[in-house]
Every structure is written in C-alpha cells, then in structure tokens.
Amino acid sequence: IKYTLTEELCKHGIREYAISETQKYGHVTYFWNGNRSEKFDESLETYVEIPSDVVPFEQRPWMKAAEITDKLCEAIESGNYDFIRTNYPNGDMVGHTGSLPATIIGVESVDLELARVIESVNKVNGILLVTADHGNADDESKTSHTLAPVPFIVYNAECELKEGEDLGLSNVAATVCDFLGLEPNEHLSLI
C-alpha cells in the first residue's frame, strides 16, 4: 500500500509514537504503515508494545488499557512527539466473546482511560482524534464486526469540519496533515 500517513509524515520530519498492547500492536504499526514491517524512518518513529495478558478476554475485559494510557500520557506530556496513535482493543476483542457484561466493562475501561488522555492533551494544548475502523461492541448478539458507522470525534480543535455522507475513514489521514499544518498530498482527501 502506497501513500500511507506515516510515510507522508516522515517526509515532513514529523516525530511519531505508536502504542498498543500485543493484541493490536500490529494495527498501529504494520497495518497502519500499509502492511510494511519496517519503519519509514527509524529516527522519527517510536513503537511501544505492552504485552497482553494470556487469559480469555471476558475474564479480564479491561485488558491493558491502564498500562497503555500510562505510557500514552507520558508520551503526550513529554513534548517529544508531534503525532501519537494508539489502539485500545477492548471493544473489539472483548466484543468478539459475545459477553455483554464483559463488553460493557471493556468499553467503560476505555472511557475511564480516555478521561486521563484528555487531561494530558489539555496540558499540552493538543488535539485528540478518536475513531474506529469498525463496530463490534455495539451488537451483543454478534461476535463478528458490525457495519455500524463509527464516530470521528475531534477534541480541542479550533476548526470546522465538513459534514457529509461521502466522508469516512479515507479522510482521516488528510485531516491529520491539516491539523499538523501540512498540505496533504493528492492521494489524501480532507475532511
């Protein structure tokens, strides 16, 4: 896959930090980078993997959300990075179990951690974007991904976003470039 966001950001010297637990580490690295195993620029990219617990997800639905957030907030407040991404796997992985009580706990765990992330974002006057690539925790009777629309939440941004039916995940990369003051390349469509 060509023209990934990380490739574009590295061209502009943007320092990146990616973190998740083992269950979704590949999603913030390999898949995020267009199925590429190696970094585009070793000096600009930092990857952190929090080891996942080896227990059924419904037995520990909070997973490693707190540990991810500890490192995430540290990275945000450090001032060492211009763009930070994470993946909290709780809604997806616990949602696959089909256990509604466990899924609720998993999602509530992420809610609690996002409150901590917001505190760190506020300290540095940053912008927080929250989205997902699919639904899963939104339909208790299914253990597969749903077709439900996913949110795209912008926190603390002094901007106006377009609204429309033709906008979606394909617009996220250009929007990130815009927030960073970069002109998105012709392959990235802006929200």
Spans of model-derived segments:
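Feature captures the catalytic ectodomains and active-site-proximal regions of enzymes
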Residues: 1-191
